[in-house]
Structure formats: structure tokens, C-alpha cells
Amino acid sequence: MSKYKFETLQLHVGQEEPDPATDARAVPIYQTTSYVFKNSAHAAARFGLTDAGNIYGRLTNSTQDVLEKRLAALEGGTAALAVASGAAAITYTIEALAANGGHIVSQKTIYGGSYNLLAHTLTHYGISTTFVDAHNLEELENAIQENTRAVYLETLGNPNSDIPDIDAIAEIAHRHGLPLVIDNTFGTPYLIRPIEHGADIVVHSATKFIGGHGTTLGGIIVDSGKFDWKASGKYPEIADANPSYHGVSFVDAAGPAAFVTYIRAILLRDTGATISPFNAFLLLQGVETLSLRLDRHAENTKKVVEYLAKHPQVEHVNHPSLPDHPDHELYEKYFPNGGASIFTFEIKGGQEEAHKFIDNLKIFSLLANVADVKSLVIHPATTTHSQLTAEELEDQGIKPNTIRLSIGTEHIDDIIADLESGFAAIK
């Protein structure tokens, strides 16, 4: 279906024809744990990866399969794996690349949960991380070590929507024989396709824009199919005979889908962060309206940013669409159709004023999620990034008066009126 536009692909990929068993137009929910094999030879072929298809519900499901094919197509990848959450998608990706003493070079301005995962949790599994200013390409390249196994970025940093130069960083990573991993949760494939700029693996918290309605947890790993795992010589679990799967080389068995096949067959098999068929179904409902929602998110965000930038009670707005933002040129390069509907601003005052502003909003919901059709707000320093030290918060540009907004699809007049009520409470 590659000849079709994004808006058509988001509706049809993975189910080009009605369901063969029922003729249903909507993707059915295949609520089953297991699958019947035709005979013993068929079962052996499935387990040997010589016949593609369902083996067991922890690994695959037909509803999940449609979601995976659709997201792979939308991102321009070869294959995808859907898992139980965005955190699982990121964890599996890093573990697959860097287990047993590997090292990651990561952008420092990332989601607090991902920062904590890399800085603390994964160290117990022998994985270390150096956090760098992704705008300083020399610093990033100098951080690469002999045991480095990947470079990790976000298309739009969390929470300040800063933007790395993906093309330039991809060139550095590839020159050192490393894959570039990009979290495109905030970007979405509708606004930016990182694979077209050199990314090798793209991850998502599908809980956010992909689902879009604050109802469903899920994560996605998309394999570009472009990285040469054998040539690099750094990934024997993927490229060489793997003793955990009766000597299979995933490169030989799965070709360009080797990376996600390895995660599915080994990590997902053994640790089981499986997405439920129902969650896969709900995320598919979100995918079908992705472009429509993102257009409205972008339209509303532009107007909110303009409003905040002129407000006398606002100290600073961190949004790359503003001409004085340090990433404005990168924003115009990578996001020509707008975006960055999750961003921060600094209210005049401190933490007390920030909390009072938030507590007097009515339409904006105070919660930890983002990228919902409903507008959302939170105080990062005391919530999503509260695990960080004072020094780490400062390093990531998060201050006591920083407020994060996630702009929804409500009528813009109501959104701005609600923000005005928050400001009125602290006059």
C-alpha cells in the first residue's frame, strides 16, 4: 500500500481486505491465549521461525499484528513490535542493544522516566549511560566509548520540546558503527519520520498521541531494517547463532526485521510485557484519526503559544516555534507542519505561584499523561521529574516555576479562557 498517502495508510494497512474469517470491516479483537497448529511439522516450523505466524499469545496476536504493520508502515520501517507500555518498548530496546556491559550515549533532556531508567535502573543490568547536550555534537561524539552500543534521542524533548539535529547525529552514530534510537512519542510519524533522517530504531509510548484519548497503555518498537548488525560486529545476540533460541541467527532468520524479531523471540518471550488484544484494538482506533487530531493539536498549540508569549505574568515560553528559541531553525527543518503541543512555560514567581495557577484551572486536567485530546497540565519539578536532583533539574531546564502544558483539541477560546482564569488567581 506504499502508493497511498498517510491519511489512507492510517486506516487500511494491516487489514487491506475485510477479516477473512468473519468479513468484518473493523479489526476484530482476537481474545485468545494460544493457536492451533495444523500438525506437528507446522508447529515445528512456527517455532523454528521458518513459517511466520502465531505461536503463543505472549508473543503474537492477530489484533496486535495489524497494529504492528500499521505503525511500521506509518514510520517507514520494515517491521514493528507492540508491547505493554512505552516504558517496556524503551527498556527492551536498550536491553537488546547494550546488555552485559554496554554503554548508551543519550540526550540529557528526555522524559524523566527514561532518564531514571538509563541513569539508575539499567545500571543494575550492567548498562551505563552518558548524558550529553545533544546540541553539542562534539560533546556527543566524544562521549562514545569502545563499549557504546547506541545513541538515544527524543524528536521533541520532554518537557521543553527541544529538538536535536537528527541528520547530523545519525551521521556521527553510523560513522562509529552504532544504531540511532529515537523516541518519536511527541513527534508522531504524521509530523516527522525519523527513519527518513537516519534513525535505525524508533520507539513510541503509544499511550500518548497514537492512542490519543487517555484510555490505553501501549508501546511500539519500529525496526527500520537498515542497520547492518553483522557488519558492526557489536551485536552477537542478534547477528550470530543465539544459544537461547537453538542456535538461530536472527539476521539470517528474519533479515531486515532481525532486531524486533530478536526482542519478540527472546526478551518478550522471557519477560512478558505483552500488549493485550483489547489494548491493541483501542490503539488502532486512535491510529485511524491520528492525522486529524494532530492537525487540531498543532492549530491550538500555535495560538496558545502566541497568547502566552505576550502575557505579562509569563516569564518565558519554551516552544521551538518562537523565533527567539534556540531550536527554531531545527523546528522549521524537521516540523514544517507544526507540532510540539507538549511544552513548558515559566510563570512569574516560583513554585507557589505555579501550583496556584494549576489548581485554578478547570478544563486542563492535572495528571501525568500527555498527548490526550483533553488539555492537560502538570508541575514537572514536583511530579514527573521529581526523582531528579536539583542539579539534574537545572541541567534539564526545569525550574520551580516551570509548568508543562499538553494542548488538547477543545475550542481554542475555551482553552485560553481557562488559562486566563489560572493567571487571574495569582494576581
Segment roles from a protein language model:
Residues 2, 18, 80-311:
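Conserved PLP-enzyme active-site core in the AAT-like
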Residues 2-61, 69-70:
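N-terminal "arm"/small-domain region of PLP-dependent enzymes with the aminotransferase-like
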Residues 39-91, 113-120:
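Conserved N-terminal alpha-helix of the aminotransferase class I/II PLP-enzyme fold
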Residues 119, 128, 146, 293, ...:
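PLP-dependent enzyme catalytic core of the Aspartate aminotransferase-like
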Residues 151, 219-221, 317, 343, ...:
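Well-ordered beta-strand positions enriched in small/hydrophobic/aromatic, beta-favoring residues
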Residues 156, 185-187, 322, 348, ...:
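Active-site beta-loop-alpha junctions enriched in small/polar residues
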Residues 222, 344-346, 406-408:
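Short hydrophobic/aromatic beta-strand micro-patches
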Residues 271-274, 278-280, 285, 289, ...:
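Conserved small-domain helix->loop->beta segment predominantly found in fold-type I
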